Regions:
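HIT superfamily nucleotide-processing domains
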Residues: 1-141
Length: 141
């Protein structure tokens, strides 16, 4: 059953969201967040502005605009962090609000050659480190 708007962490901008992510900026039709758990250095989420669950619910123009946002963030991550590969994931099994995980992968890093862990709970940074990453990503957009 889809998450109702009243319980959606992306729509409500609740405490759970602030524990998981740092807001970076608004994009064309979405918002960009830095995932606080940084086992995959540079991991971000691109979150569609409206409470939509599935890609097929978007019009062609909406879908294309969302994917432009995703591609823009992918280019910024590539520029700032130089990963070997970026994995893209749109699951929304538990949080039914359209969003895309952008997960940089590094040859000698965790999960290279496989699927990334959703939240390994291993690598957290200081507020200053998050702020520095946010500024670098913003500058690369």
């Amino acid at each position: 059953m889809p998450t109702p708007v009243s319980e959606c962490l992306y729509c409500q901008r609740n405490e759970t969201l602030s524990k998981l992510m740092v807001r970076i900026c608004d994009l064309e039709v979405s918002q960009l967040f830095l995932f606080k758990e940084q086992s995959y250095h540079g991991r971000c989420n691109v979150v569609y502005n409206d409470h939509t669950v599935e890609f097929h619910e978007l019009s062609d123009d909406q879908r294309n605009a969302f994917m432009r946002d995703v591609a823009r963030v992918g280019r910024a991550i590539a520029k700032v962090f130089s990963p070997e590969k970026i994995n893209y994931g749109a699951y929304a099994d538990k949080i039914s609000h359209l969003h895309m995980h952008l997960v940089p992968k590094y040859k000698d890093g965790p999960g290279f050659g496989g699927v990334f862990e959703m939240n390994p709970q291993k690598t957290f940074l200081s507020d200053e480190e998050y702020a520095g990453m946010v500024e670098k990503i913003k500058a690369a957009l």
